[in-house]
Amino acid sequence: DRLLEAKAAFLHSSFITVGGEGILFAGNKQAGKSTQAALWNKYRGALTVNGDRAVIRLEGGGLRAYGSAFCGSSGIALDESAPVKAIVLLGQASENTVTPVPAPEAFRELLGKMTYDTSVQSSVEAAAAIAAEAVARVPVVRLVCTPDERSVEALEAALWRK
């Protein structure tokens, strides 16, 4: 797969930029990816670059996200990119909490949300290498949250130490 050869892969996530940095909201269907992107747009003026499948790529010593044509039901697919500030694994709750995800768990979660051919060993190995390096380069946090501004405030405080 040419994408994997370029140290890049699709990640099932909503991708926003705020202050020139990217945040990837990753989760299963109905986890709140589009909701979080919309909340960040409304309350922090973030730009939603992609609503369903961003491309992540290992570049230099960091991780960069790119918009893709695969936007799901959001219809949002912009040709933009940004260095990744964090990957946020989503869950729903009545209170907002942000916790760091240990590397082994972050690796499993990330690999499970990437798109690659599981029947081809070299694709599996390449995707695993990208996932391992991605979690070593950028913070992966779990945000369990309410669908309102308080979730934005909680994540912002955790990522920017406000």
What are these regions, as identified by a protein language model?
Residues 31-33:
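Conserved glycine(s) of the Walker
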Residues 12-14, 18-28, 41-162:
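Glycine-rich, often acidic-flanked micro-motifs
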Residues 36-37:
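Post-Walker A alpha-helix
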Residues 1-10:
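N-terminal pre-Walker A segment at the start of P-loop NTPase domains
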